[in-house]
């Protein structure tokens, strides 16, 4: 499979990391390797470790970056087929236990995952309900849709997709599966359309968009994994090291903003004459407001419209 994908906020993400020769960097979401290729072009020496839980992305990278993966005294690129929640553990296995100089995340589903019909991510193609980033994972969208209670389904659709008709959709799903399991993406799309009022179906894009997003987030535990990974990444960053995070959904951005705030701001008790070392901030925000795509990128890459980039430096 060719894992072609147009990287969003390419220069902004990598340039803000300020990569330096000899550094150790982590691409937490390797995908098509666009950000990785640009970062490696900025340094003559140093190593990038690319993580991706998608087997197809790793196999594609092994072909497209074969010249950089050849073992030598100082490998330029190493690939890890794993979720970015296991950053430190996997880095130690590779022999990197002294921290990293930079890390970046490009969150969300990549274009090839949407375009590969049998992955079940998209409401545009008819396929078995799947939505697993990691194909070795047991739980998929089919299981959630056919086993969760009406309340659990409604909560997922509302919390992860901001779907205001979550209760109606969840009710219709539970009623339909009484007759037979809901197997395919198109079956689910039809159920969603039936549950949403006609006036709402005519506005705001595809009626199944929010529900499919919510199920994908739930299947892959995206928000829990993101929060745990960011905490770990900040801990293993060396002083002066930087972290860049691109988000596409409001709930993702809220998590990044909250964690960056937690480590960059200090609440000193009233009357305390100085700030103890264990209360001092460990991050400095590079940008108070998120960086967004330029006019040129917005015109050439539709995926960039909702992208937000936040950057911070380890103190």
From Swiss-Prot:
Disulfide-bonded cysteine pairs: these are none
SUPFAM superfamilies cross-referenced by the UniProt entry: Putative methyltransferase TM0872, insert domain, S-adenosyl-L-methionine-dependent methyltransferases
Q: Which GO terms describe its molecular function?
A: rRNA (cytosine-N4-)-methyltransferase activity
Q: What is its EC number?
A: 2.1.1.199
Q: Where is this region: Disordered?
A: 290-315
Reaction(s) this enzyme catalyzes, per UniProt: cytidine(1402) in 16S rRNA + S-adenosyl-L-methionine = N(4)-methylcytidine(1402) in 16S rRNA + S-adenosyl-L-homocysteine + H(+)
Q: Would you say which domain of life the source belongs to?
A: Bacteria
Q: Which Gene3D superfamilies match?
A: Putative methyltransferase TM0872, insert domain, Vaccinia Virus protein VP39
Where can this protein be found?
Cytoplasm
Principal cellular location given in the protein's record: cytoplasm
Q: Point to the regions of Polar residues compositional bias.
A: 292-304
Ligase as UniProt keyword: no
Binding site residues for S-adenosyl-L-methionine? 33-35, 52, 84, 106, 113
Protein's recorded name: Ribosomal RNA small subunit methyltransferase H
User: Origin organism of this chain?
Assistant: Lactobacillus helveticus (strain DPC 4571)
């Amino acid at each position: 499979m060719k894992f072609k994908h147009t990287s969003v906020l390419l220069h902004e993400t990598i340039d803000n990391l300020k990569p330096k020769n000899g550094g150790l960097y982590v691409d937490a979401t390797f995908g098509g390797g666009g950000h990785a290729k640009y970062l490696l072009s900025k340094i003559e020496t140093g190593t990038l470790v690319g993580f991706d839980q998608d087997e197809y992305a790793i196999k594609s990278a092994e072909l497209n970056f074969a010249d950089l993966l050849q073992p030598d005294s100082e490998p330029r690129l190493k690939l890890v087929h794993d979720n970015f929640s296991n950053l430190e553990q996997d880095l130690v296995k590779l022999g990197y236990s002294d921290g990293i100089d930079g890390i970046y995340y490009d969150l969300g589903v990549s274009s090839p995952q949407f375009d590969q019909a049998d992955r079940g991510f998209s409401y545009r193609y008819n396929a078995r309900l799947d939505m697993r980033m990691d194909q070795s994972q047991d739980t998929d969208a089919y299981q959630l849709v056919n086993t969760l209670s009406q309340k659990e389904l409604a909560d997922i659709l509302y919390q992860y997709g901001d779907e205001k008709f979550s209760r109606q959709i969840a009710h219709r799903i539970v009623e339909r599966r009484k007759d037979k399991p809901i197997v395919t993406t198109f079956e689910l799309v039809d159920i969603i359309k039936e549950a949403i009022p006609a006036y709402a179906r005519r506005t705001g894009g595809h009626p199944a968009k929010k529900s499919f997003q919510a199920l994908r987030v739930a299947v892959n535990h995206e928000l829990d994994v993101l929060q745990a990974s960011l905490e770990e990444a900040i801990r293993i960053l060396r002083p002066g090291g930087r972290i860049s995070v691109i988000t596409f959904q409001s709930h993702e951005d809220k998590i990044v903003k909250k964690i960056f705030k937690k480590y960059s701001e200090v609440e000193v008790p009233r009357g305390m004459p100085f700030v103890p070392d264990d209360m001092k901030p460990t991050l400095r925000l590079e940008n108070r407001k998120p960086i967004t795509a330029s006019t040129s990128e917005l015109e050439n890459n539709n995926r960039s419209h909702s992208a937000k980039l936040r950057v911070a430096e380890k103190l």
